[in-house]
Each structure stands twice: as structure tokens, then as C-alpha cells.
């Protein structure tokens, strides 16, 4: 589950919104007993009258703490209980929060499909990341979008990485909607991944779209 909070304020010509999400997998994080180190914190601004930057968002996310590194159940000799190592997305008996090797919900938790040993488990669920996005429409015909994500990865508490691994992702997108051809638009997107978790990769997309009204 999660605790979600947001605060928005509307100015005469722009709008700002700050939001906070605190997620949990068990009682230790539900009661905030072990702090609020793992979270999603974001800030978003909308500028509808600014053609160059219509909106931008900045987010910080951490899944690194997971209630701490120590797990100890109660015993006769040591009655104190420590509920650490929550091990997000993982489970001892089944394959965890995934479907056909792809993680569900969170795009930055490394999916099991990328495991080189072909084992269906999560080898990297302790991350810290920054995400930045902006979009704009400088003219009536052209629009753009930019997404940047930078992550640091620690593996898991049970099988940590030898070093902190970095992975960065970039997306640049341009759209063109000519006035001469009503209903037609073209979008070109280029994406690049650079890092030590998923390696380096490059991809592109070209999309042509035609919209029309059947009632006319």
C-alpha cells in the first residue's frame, strides 16, 4: 500500500503541484516505525501561456532503505524483533511482482527478464533516482517532449552489487501537425540508455497519425 499526499496552488497564469508518496509492503513501514527514507517526492509546474515550456516535472525516488539492513524474528534469547530487508517485489515462495519476466508497476526496478542467469527473481530492487521531464509547443505546428532519468542501483540486501551501478535513460520527441493537412500528425522519438545495469541501447520511433470524425 501507500500513503499519498499532494498540495496544489493555482496562480493567475500558472499552476504548481507538490506530491509525496510513501509506499510500504508490511507492518514495519505501515506504521512509519523505521522512518520515511523510501519515498517518491515530486514537483510539477504547468505554464499554459508559455509556448516554449508548457509544463515540467522533477521527481526523486528511493527504494534503498527497505526498513534497514537487519531482519531478526523474536527468539527466547533475544525477544527484540527487527523488521528490515523488506525486499520489494520479491517473495520467498513465488516469483514476485512480475508477469512473464517484466516487473509490474515500477519501471526502474530491474525486471527479471534481464537476468543473465535466466532465474526469475529480482536482482535489483534498491535504487535511488532522479527524473526530469518537460514539454512545450513553440508554434501551432511543432511540439516537443524531453524525459531524463538518472539512477543509482545497489542490487538487493541479500545479493548486493559489488559497486553502486549507474543507469541513465534519455528520450527526445518532436511532433509536427501541419495546418495544410487537417487531422494528420507525425512524431519522431529517439531514446538512449546508458549504464551498467541494462547496458547501452538506442531506439527510435516514427509515428504517423490521422484523426477524423465519423459523424461528419
Language-model-detected regions and their locations in the chain:
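Outer-membrane beta-barrel pore domains
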Residues: 2-3, 8-216
Amino acid at each position: 500500500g501507500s500513503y499519498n499526499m499532494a498540495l496544489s496552488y493555482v496562480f493567475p497564469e500558472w499552476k504548481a503541484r507538490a506530491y509525496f508518496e510513501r509506499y510500504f509492503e508490511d507492518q514495519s513501514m505501515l506504521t512509519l516505525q523505521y522512518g520515511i527514507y523510501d519515498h517518491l517526492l515530486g514537483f510539477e509546474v504547468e505554464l499554459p501561456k508559455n509556448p516554449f515550456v508548457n509544463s515540467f516535472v522533477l521527481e526523486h525516488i528511493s527504494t534503498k532503505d527497505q526498513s534497514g539492513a537487519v531482519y531478526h524474528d523474536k527468539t527466547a534469547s533475544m525477544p527484540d524483533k527487527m523488521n528490515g530487508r523488506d525486499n520489494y517485489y520479491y517473495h520467498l515462495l513465488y516469483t514476485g511482482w512480475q508477469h512473464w519476466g517484466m516487473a509490474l508497476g515500477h519501471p526502474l526496478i530491474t525486471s527479471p527478464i534481464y537476468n543473465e542467469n535466466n532465474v526469475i527473481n529480482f536482482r535489483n530492487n534498491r535504487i535511488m533516482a532522479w527524473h526530469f521531464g518537460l514539454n512545450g509547443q513553440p508554434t501551432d505546428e511543432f511540439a516537443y517532449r524531453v524525459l531524463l532519468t538518472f539512477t543509482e542501483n545497489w542490487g538487493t540486501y541479500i545479493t548486493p552489487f559489488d559497486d553502486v551501478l549507474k543507469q541513465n535513460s534519455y528520450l527526445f520527441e518532436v511532433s509536427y501537425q501541419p495546418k495544410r493537412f487537417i487531422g494528420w500528425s507525425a512524431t519522431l522519438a529517439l531514446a538512449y540508455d546508458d549504464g551498467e545495469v541494462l547496458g547501452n541501447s538506442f531506439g527510435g520511433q516514427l509515428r504517423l497519425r490521422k484523426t477524423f470524425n465519423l459523424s461528419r
